[in-house]
């Protein structure tokens, strides 16, 4: 079953960013919406027609979090037979002591939205600071509180920069949360000479994945992508492979087909 992140279709969706999607108010990223973009309520049917069975949805692609709108989107997903695999909450810094209380409350409201949408998981950001054992414990405590308050949605974190910028910190965070929080492994976030070694140290802990291939004007870095996928497969991973495309070519659907073919070449 094909899975995709809505970020991969940001251009298809008219580059829409909700005007109140930031913790501090206003949009969480710069950019202007373009006319003629696909409405989010029409995305489930578009996914169905192209063979996708599940979606990871960026929070800023939601134009409204009213109960009525969330209900409409849940019905549209159900009618198309598309599962909401993960709500990706793409703002917030739990590691910032001046903002952490406000961020935790804000994330709690997004977890309520995830529950209303029937999402299986919600991915939360941890923070931009350098990791220390004390900071990891503090952030883990906040994540555990959020998980306890929202048991109907599984919280996952991602191997990103900052607090979770290396395998040791990711493993420490999962250990400190005592199983209350899972891992979304992103194959494109890390680089450098130790990339595959670092991915190998966390791959067996992952329950969902961003299958992200780097693209340039000359095409995909297929060698790196295949190597990353093999690391995942050799660790016994059998969860979703959510396709992530953010390369220069505007033909997002075609590039997603290419990524899917590369995934099948490794996973079958």
Model-found features: residue ranges?
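Hydrophobic faces of well-ordered beta-strands that scaffold small-molecule active sites
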Residues: 2-9, 55-57, 84-89, 122-124, ...
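Conserved, mostly hydrophobic/aromatic
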Residues: 4, 47, 77, 114, ...
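Acidic-and-aromatic substrate-binding clefts and catalytic sites of carbohydrate-active enzymes
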Residues: 34-36, 57-72, 92-102, 128-134, ...
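A structural motif
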Residues: 49-53, 118-119, 152, 206, ...
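Acidic/histidine-rich catalytic cores of soluble enzymes
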Residues: 54-55, 144-230
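Active-site acidic/histidine proton-transfer and metal-coordination neighborhood
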Residues: 76-182, 255, 262
């Amino acid at each position: 079953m094909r899975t995709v992140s809505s970020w991969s279709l940001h251009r298809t969706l008219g580059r829409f960013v909700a005007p109140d999607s930031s913790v501090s108010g206003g949009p969480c990223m710069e950019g202007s919406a373009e006319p003629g973009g696909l409405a989010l309520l029409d995305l489930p049917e578009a996914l169905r027609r192209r063979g996708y069975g599940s979606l990871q949805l960026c929070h800023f692609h939601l134009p409204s979090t009213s109960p009525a709108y969330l209900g409409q989107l849940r019905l549209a997903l159900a009618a198309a037979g598309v599962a909401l695999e993960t709500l990706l909450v793409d703002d917030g810094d739990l590691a910032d002591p001046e903002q952490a209380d406000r961020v935790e409350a804000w994330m709690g409201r997004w977890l309520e939205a995830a529950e209303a949408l029937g999402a299986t998981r919600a991915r939360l950001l941890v923070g931009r600071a350098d990791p220390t054992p004390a900071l990891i414990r503090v952030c883990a405590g906040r994540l555990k509180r959020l998980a306890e308050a929202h048991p109907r949605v599984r919280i996952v974190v991602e191997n990103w920069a900052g607090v979770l910028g290396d395998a040791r910190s990711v493993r420490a965070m999962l250990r400190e949360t005592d199983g209350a929080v899972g891992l979304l492994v992103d194959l494109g976030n890390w680089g450098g000479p130790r990339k595959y070694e670092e991915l190998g140290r966390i791959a067996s802990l992952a329950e969902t994945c961003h299958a992200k291939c780097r693209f340039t004007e000359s095409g995909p870095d297929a060698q790196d992508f295949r190597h990353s996928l093999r690391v995942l497969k050799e660790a016994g991973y059998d969860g979703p492979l959510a396709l992530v495309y953010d390369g220069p070519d505007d033909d997002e659907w075609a590039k997603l087909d290419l990524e899917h073919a590369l995934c099948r070449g490794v996973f079958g």
